[in-house]
Regions:
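Peripheral, non-catalytic segments that deliver or gate enzyme domains
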Residues: 1-2, 8-62, 68-325
């Protein structure tokens, strides 16, 4: 600080940076359960505010203002998660730049903060299934060593709304590999629970559990952590997969729920000369984003893997998609 304070143009540089950052920023709207949400920053707010409106031309109102989560601005909003039934909105926060996360839940309709509160979560979101959600956490650390102890034995829990964290159900742990990380996701119809294992390679292992069968075990889909395996949706018995397995620039494959092992997967959209950077299922179509010449290019494919059209963008830039299957 002594050195920086002696820079003669420091104040001028700060003023210039402040001037160029001080403009209104509005994010792309997204639709959830009949309402429209978007992030907005008036210019110099530390964090963008999430707004909601009842229709595209409706009056926006504040849904969640992360700047009010603390008086000193040390609490950051790290994620927001809407339940599939529309009743709840979970959000994760981190304090003072820590990796530790806390999960809170609001009533989506009223905005009321509910009593449900999760502590000592880490590297996680809130993955909803019914009136509850899956999350990843460690055991509570020794008091006074919250930021110095080595974290081991990452676990996945299920929290049922209206109950204390102490009653949360342990869904998965693997004490044979205490330094690995475990996270969960659920498809839109809440029929399949996916388990991701990472920390021993550049990618992840992937397992699945059929939630329609209460006592079904986790079944291995792919275990080589040198590759990335990401399910993007489940339609019928078919799991659509985004992966770089034997395809450095990524491709789409499909797996059968009844025969989910990697050896039985089928290629759907082959690897291209351009990197496939994102994929999703929206309105029974595949929306694919490729990186070409330092810009995104968007395409629509059928669920059969055949290209339908390129989406012509107004200019070079980046693009993203969101929506229901």
């Amino acid at each position: 600080n002594d050195y920086l304070s002696k820079i003669p143009f420091r104040d001028a540089l700060l003023k210039r940076l402040t001037d160029v950052a001080n403009y209104e920023k509005i994010g792309t709207p997204f639709k959830k359960h009949g309402k429209y949400y978007f992030y907005k920053n008036d210019g110099l707010q530390n964090q963008s505010v999430l707004y909601v409106q009842d229709s595209l031309d409706g009056e926006p109102r504040v849904f969640l203002d992360p700047n009010k989560l603390s008086d000193d601005g040390t609490v950051a909003l790290t994620g927001i998660y809407f339940s599939n039934n529309g009743k709840y909105t979970g959000y994760t926060i981190a304090c003072s730049g820590s990796d530790w996360q806390e999960i809170y839940v609001m009533d989506t309709e009223t905005g009321k903060l509910l009593d449900d509160h999760i502590e000592w979560a880490k590297f996680t979101g809130a993955t909803w299934q019914g009136d509850g959600f899956y999350y990843s956490a460690y055991d509570a650390p020794v008091k006074g060593k919250e930021f110095s102890n080595v974290n081991e034995n990452h676990k996945i829990y299920y929290h049922k709304m209206g109950t204390p964290q102490s009653q949360d159900k342990l869904v998965y742990q693997n004490q044979a590999y205490p330094k690995r990380f475990y996270t969960a996701s659920v498809n839109e119809d809440e029929t399949i629970l996916f388990l991701y294992e990472s920390g021993d390679g550049r990618g992840n292992a992937l397992y699945m559990k059929d939630l329609r069968k209460p006592n079904a075990p986790f079944v291995a889909m792919a275990t080589d952590m040198d590759y990335t395996y990401a399910p993007i949706e489940v339609i019928g018995d078919k799991i659509y997969m985004f992966t770089n397995y034997n395809a450095p620039k990524y491709r789409l494959m499909t797996a059968d729920i009844n025969k989910p092992a990697l050896k039985d997967w089928t290629e759907l959209v082959p690897e291209s000369e351009n990197v496939l950077s994102d994929a999703g299922v929206i309105g029974e179509k595949l929306f694919l984003t490729y990186d070409k010449d330092a810009a995104n290019h968007a395409y629509v494919y059928g669920l059969d893997g055949k290209e339908i059209q390129e989406i012509k963008l107004p200019s070079l830039g980046s693009v993203g998609f969101s929506g229901d299957k």
